[in-house]
Amino acid sequence: MLQCAPKKNERLRGSCDFCTQSKLRCNKNKPSCRRCTLQQQPCVYSVARRTGRPPKHPRKANDCQEANGQHGDQDPVTSTPGGSYQQQSNHLLDVEGDGANFTLADASTTAQGRETAASPALDNALLVGETFGFSSLLDDPLIQSDDFFSFSLCMPPGEKEGHMASPRTLNGSTGPCSPTVLSSIDVPHLPARFGFLESSVESGLHGRTRPHLVEQPDKTVPSSFSEIEKIYDEGLTFSGLDSAINAVTNNGKGEPNISGTMAAHPHSKRQCFCSTSMSKLQMLVLHPTLCQKNSRARFDMALFLEEVVFSIYRDVLQCLVCQSKSLHSLASLCICTDWVIEALRDVAQDLSSGQDNLGGFRAGLYPPKDKFSICVGRFVLDDQLRESCTRSLVRYRLRKLIPIMDTMMKLNHRGAGGALSQAIRTMVEDVHHKIESALGMMEL
């Protein structure tokens, strides 16, 4: 009589207990395996505890189908609160093509962020590192706050604050590939205390409707409205491309609205925003007011950019995504650092020659009578004290940048041998020479 097959709960393991505990391969020879026979010990096969996949319950599927049938008469667009946003996301996905690497569900869940799908060409450019180097969210509250991209005019007392035109009023094109669709960032502006860069914009925008309320800009500042409109269009396009690059880097997730996301949520998905920080810095450094020939940057603007460079450098080293592995990022940061040191060296030269470039450098509500004075509230520094404070401040800022360049040189040794690595080494040595010459000039 044939023996029936054992039940599921009575089946034995394939390997004996001794081989299983010793993590050795068992030849599964029952009743005694080869290893247990050689060692002359009992070979025990325990009952297998593994169970199969639990059976499916078709009743739940039927319940879901019935629930879908009850709500089938409703419009899916009007029934959901985010229907209008899903239509907009569909439009963005259709515009960018089939190369987007995130779905419509991801776009609907992050409705507050900037959702921009990127094409495979941008993805390849980011991986190769041809145009942009790297992407960290600044810890500086000035950069993170909305005031960094808001416009606050410096009007005389008693006048109402003006309102800056939106990007859509400056850029007439509203096509699917226009910068307006690519980016939801407002036109980049400086805070109110850096209002000297906005005098030309104020005169150009308000010159059509009413007499402008600010002083005439210098000759080095562009004053025509067409030139200003071109500058804003270029900046808006740059911001749109930066949004697309962040979408590729972070798998379609835009820049978070809450500051310090990486520090507050260390276990969340890794996101890199170093390119956003570098883009903001480059847009300031390449501002037409700062890059004119035969003109020097304002001292307060140089100090502001020095703080931004130091913050970006610190955040890039702490970034868990890029970890300062990109030579393009080091080159971009080295160029911006070189510009800041050039501006500080100009201040040192002016101090050594008996002049200064402190026009308008003040912190307070009441402007000083002398435009070359430093005012803190109602307290105005005299010439000797002002020169001493300026020398100490410039010397401190220059010495603070020395360890930055030393670290750049150490990071550059990992990619030694290439043309870009050699260029970074040359730039770092040149910046070191500029710092030493400026410090020696101030000591003399």
Curated annotation (Swiss-Prot):
It is found in: Nucleus. Its main location: nucleus. Residues 50-59 have a biased composition (Basic residues). CDD domains: GAL4. Residues 16-43 bind DNA. GO terms for molecular function: DNA binding; DNA-binding transcription factor activity, RNA polymerase II-specific; zinc ion binding. Gene3D superfamilies: Zn(2)-C6 fungal-type DNA-binding domain. It comes from the Eukaryota. Residues 49-88 are annotated as: Disordered. Residues 76-88 have a biased composition (Polar residues). One of its GO terms (cellular component) is nucleus. Keywords: DNA-binding, Metal-binding, Nucleus, Transcription, Transcription regulation, Zinc. It holds the Pfam family Zn_clus. Transcription factor that regulates the expression of the gene clusters that mediate the biosynthesis of the host-selective toxins (HSTs) AF-toxins responsible for Alternaria black spot of strawberry disease by the strawberry pathotype. On cellular level, AF-toxins affect plasma membrane of susceptible cells and cause a sudden increase in loss of K(+) after a few minutes of toxin treatment. Gene clusters encoding host-selective toxins (HSTs) are localized on conditionally dispensable chromosomes (CDCs), also called supernumerary chromosomes, where they are present in multiple copies. The CDCs are not essential for saprophytic growth but controls host-selective pathogenicity. PANTHER family: MONODICTYPHENONE CLUSTER TRANSCRIPTION FACTOR-RELATED (PTHR31069:SF31), OLEATE-ACTIVATED TRANSCRIPTION FACTOR 1-RELATED (PTHR31069). This is Transcription activator AFTR-2. It comes from Alternaria alternata (Alternaria rot fungus). The lineage of its organism: Eukaryota, Fungi, Dikarya, Ascomycota, Pezizomycotina. The gene is AFTR-2.
